[in-house]
Structure formats: structure tokens, C-alpha cells
Amino acid sequence: MILFSPDERNNMTDASYHLPAFYELWARWGPEEDRALWARAAAVSRDYLVKAAHSKTGLVPNFGQFDGSPWGFRGPETAAFREDAWRVAMNWSVDRSWWGKDSRQRELSDRLQRFFESQGMETYGDNWKLDGTLIRDRHSPGLVATNGVASLASTDGARARKFTEALWNLDVPSSKVFRYYDGLLSLMSLLHASGRFQVIEPKPRAVNARASRTAVTLPRASSTAAR
């Protein structure tokens, strides 16, 4: 399982570091001697994300123990849903869209989007206790963006459309406080949702490699958001 750090923080993990979409890619096309390891890592991370997500809200902790439970090693705030945790829905949703190996990821997106929809699409806060208790009411572009990517795995077309449109309608982030969490996550989310963050399958001697894309299709209200 991925560690938070190889040195003094090697007794904990971070759900946002679990990237099964990439592990699966390396398991298919990485060095042959490493492929079995990456295949196991992908399976472990898929299971971990399910364990880490709260059963009602879908929120995940910023830092966690290896069994999926939150770990507040620096106080309660490090066990809450905070900036690192914004990225987690993007991780499982891209994995679902690229590889489609874990049907549980669809429920994770549904659960998370259902929670944030209930808090007000234009006003929901960005820091929460896992049970849905609000900690900070800042409506952050970075979280709006990654919640939009969650539509890649959602089964509720009408709800997924709301979150995708919220991503699309974001102003370009200009905050100097969260230049990464707002700025870069917004950029990455637009790439994911538009299908421009791609897997290029290796094709020896091929002039043009076939691109495998992810994209959110804005559906009719009765259809699903992810194909």
C-alpha cells in the first residue's frame, strides 16, 4: 500500500495518494518484472478508497490508517475532509472511466455528489468532519472542480450534469492562498472531464498511437453522465 512518506511518516497513508488508474496502466505496460506488483497495488488502492469513504457522506479523511480509518496525528483537523482529500473523488472516477474494473466507484461518486448537492450547489463549504459537520464554509474552486470529475463515475445523470456544469462555469482561479489546490486542480479537472487527459497505448513502430480518452458527456436528465 502507498505510504504517506518513506521515512518518518511511513506508518500512515493518504487517500489522495491512491491512484489505481495509473497503477493499472503500469501493470499493463510497465517493465514486465514490475507488472504483478502494480496490479496488486491497483487492487489494494481500489479497496482502500471504498474503506476510507464515509458510509453516508462519501467524505474521506486527509490522512488515514491502513485499514481506512482516519488518523488525526496532528489533531482532529488532519482526520477531517480537507484539501488533500478533495482529490480523492478524481482518483476513483478516472479509474472507473479508464478501466471500469470496480463498480463500487459508481456508488462512491453518487454518495459524495448527493451529499454536496444537499449542502447547496453554489455555497457548499470545503472542510468537513466525515459525518458531514461543516468546519469551513469557503466555496473553493478546487473542490468544485474535482467534484465535477466525480461525474465520470456517477450513475445519476441529472445530478452529474449539475456538477459538470459547475466545473465548466468556474472562473479561472486567481487566489494566491490556494494556487495549487484551486488552480492546478481546476486545470487537471478540465482535462479529465473533457477527455484531454489520455492514456496513449504503446504501439511499437506505429506512427500514431491510439488514444484512450475519458470525457464527461452532458446527458439528458434520465441518462448517465459517464459512458
Across the structure, where does each feature detected by a protein language model lie?
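Extended ligand-binding clefts on enzyme/binding-domain cores
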Residues: 1-145, 152-158, 180
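C-terminal functional modules
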Residues: 122-227
